[in-house]
């Protein structure tokens, strides 16, 4: 079930470029350019489903899980939040991407993906910090996490994971728990 906050409801289907109804579905996406000039790549339904299943297996999600999508669905990170909700058959809440997306929501979430800027802004507001602490599984990606941000997460007792991935790998393929001295990445189930 999709629930939209702060904007009109979103219906998943071909009109907005994402549907899991066809076996031959593929999306043309632009890579980020982190490994060279941005290029168009094609990602299939099968790849998106495999990524969502690997993440779900890693975090042991179930249909009772409650997700928050606070990333732009025009990019792989936001798209994959929608795919995860469909594959995991769970509730997802959508908020317009901003530096402090938790200021726009109430309630607790089981799975949230954020970029470091969003996490840093959440740490700086005491009310929002409590919401951040209540997230069961927080993944952080899209940019490097500074040592200061890592220290703030540990100091505040926030369990979070740094991701390793890119558009070409259909989101993350490995995760490292933040809080250990050295980040040790664990490859997702099903990734060779």
Segments predicted by a language model, with ranges:
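Short beta-strand->loop structural element characteristic of the AMP-binding/adenylate-forming
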Residues: 1-12, 39-42, 91-97
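Conserved pre-ATP/AMP-binding loop-to-beta segment of ANL
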Residues: 12-30, 62-66
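Conserved AMP-binding A3 loop
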Residues: 25-53, 60
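Conserved S/T- and glycine-rich ATP-binding loop of Class I adenylate-forming
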Residues: 31-34, 67, 82, 112, ...
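Nucleotide donor/acceptor-binding cores
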Residues: 39, 65, 136
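AMP-binding/adenylate-forming
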Residues: 43-50, 66-121
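Glycine-rich helix-loop-beta junction characteristic of Rossmann-like nucleotide cofactor-binding loops
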Residues: 57-62, 128-131
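Gly/Ser/Thr-rich phosphate-binding loop
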Residues: 126-181
């Amino acid at each position: 079930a999709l629930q939209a906050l702060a904007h009109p409801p979103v219906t998943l289907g071909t009109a907005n470029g994402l549907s899991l109804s066809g076996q031959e579905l593929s999306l043309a996406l632009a890579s980020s350019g982190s490994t060279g000039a941005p290029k168009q790549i094609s990602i299939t339904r099968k790849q998106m489903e495999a990524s969502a299943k690997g993440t779900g297996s890693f975090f042991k999600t179930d249909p009772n899980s409650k997700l928050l999508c606070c990333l732009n669905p025009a990019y792989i990170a936001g798209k994959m939040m929608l795919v995860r909700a469909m594959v995991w058959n769970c509730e997802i809440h959508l908020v317009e991407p901003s530096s402090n997306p938790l200021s726009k929501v109430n309630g607790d979430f089981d799975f949230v993906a954020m970029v470091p800027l969003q996490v840093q802004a959440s740490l700086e507001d005491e009310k929002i910090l409590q919401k951040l602490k209540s997230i069961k599984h927080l993944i952080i990606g899209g940019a490097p996490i500074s040592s200061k941000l890592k220290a703030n997460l540990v100091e505040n007792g926030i369990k979070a994971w740094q991701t390793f991935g890119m558009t070409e790998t259909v989101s993350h393929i490995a995760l490292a728990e933040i809080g250990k001295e050295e980040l040790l990445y664990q490859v997702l189930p099903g990734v060779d």
